[in-house]
Amino acid sequence: MGNGVQEGSVRLREDAEAVLAGAVSSKRDHRQVLSSLLSGALAGALAKTAVAPLDRTKIIFQVSSKRFSAKEAFRLLYFTYLNEGFLSLWRGNSATMVRVIPYAAIQFSAHEEYKRILGHYYGFRGEALPPWPRLLAGALAGTTAASLTYPLDLVRARMAVTPKEMYSNIFHVFIRISREEGLKTLYFGFTPTVLGVIPYAGLSFFTYESLKSLHREYSGRPQPYPFERMVFGACAGLIGQSASYPLDVVRRRMQTAGVTGHQHGSILSTLRSIVREEGAVRGLYKGLSMNWLKGPIAVGISFTTFDLMQILLRRLQS
């Protein structure tokens, strides 16, 4: 009888320890998710604000039939500054922040979760993922974020290409689109967005994670320096944006069709229209050189900020 009581108390203690361990693990998981959300939000906000004037200029060229050149782009920036003031260069940035903060928070947090899930599935717990799951984690993270925040991206594009008299604020854009064009307009361009996000996010995260892994292997240091992270992020942005750029042009044309005089159409009809009117290379890669300037800066800032914030928050928690 004494042995039975002793065995029962041992089992009870083991059960209590298991419950306690589960609670601690759950609390740690919640902290990790919140940490990723916060770090991602800050990373996205800093990166997009830094390149907002270049981003607005790129969108204006993407949705028009004007030929793009670096000279014309900087002339547009200069005349916008002269005619509308310095802060007008950031017009639409409030809408960008409303979209980018949740988008980046979701994307980075989802990426961490997908890495964990795929690591468990492929048997790489606590280790760097092999190439294919690494690419898949990035693509899934980008698709998740784009699906949840797409209407905000359309609103941002509308505000970037219209004069301030047309839309007074973000809510005004939503109201006018709903009344004049219908709610379904808020998802025009969604398909090319997702088709573009898959290679963009997949290749961006894949390149950045791969470069960090190679750095760790060859340098012997567990963590890169901040400037090295910036370089890795810049390379990731350059590769990701170059691969997905034509679909980005198609997406912008579809999003802004209601205010630029173009007809709403499918992906293929929009592609054909761009190629017919402007040519394949000039039309589908219009503004790419500006993206090669702003993309690496934005992605470098974004990835570096996220990593450094994660390190800081882990230290504070410990």
Curated annotation (Swiss-Prot):
Entry's localization field: Mitochondrion inner membrane
Example of a GO MF term: coenzyme A transmembrane transporter activity
Segments annotated as Solcar repeats: 31-117, 129-214, 224-312
Pfam entry (one): Mito_carr
GO biological process terms, semicolon-separated: ADP transport; AMP transport; ATP transport; coenzyme A biosynthetic process; coenzyme A transmembrane transport
InterPro entries xrefs: DNA_mismatch_repair_CS (IPR014762), GDC-like (IPR002167), Mit_carrier (IPR002067), Mitochondrial_sb/sol_carrier (IPR018108), Mt_carrier_dom_sf (IPR023395)
Topological category with respect to the lipid bilayer: Multi-pass membrane protein
Gene3D superfamilies for this protein: Mitochondrial carrier domain
A GO cellular component annotation in the UniProt record: mitochondrial inner membrane
Residues annotated as transmembrane: 33-53, 89-109, 135-155, 186-206, 230-250, 293-313
Keywords noted in UniProt: Membrane, Mitochondrion, Mitochondrion inner membrane, Repeat, Transmembrane, Transmembrane helix, Transport
Catalytic reaction list: ADP(out) + CoA(in) = ADP(in) + CoA(out); 3'-dephospho-CoA(in) + ADP(out) = 3'-dephospho-CoA(out) + ADP(in); adenosine 3',5'-bisphosphate(in) + ADP(out) = adenosine 3',5'-bisphosphate(out) + ADP(in); AMP(in) + ADP(out) = AMP(out) + ADP(in)
SUPFAM superfamilies for this protein: Mitochondrial carrier (SSF103506)
Function: Mitochondrial carrier mediating the transport of coenzyme A (CoA) in mitochondria in exchange for intramitochondrial (deoxy)adenine nucleotides and adenosine 3',5'-diphosphate.
Family: Belongs to the mitochondrial carrier (TC 2.A.29) family.
The protein's name: Mitochondrial coenzyme A transporter SLC25A42
Gene this protein is translated from: Slc25a42
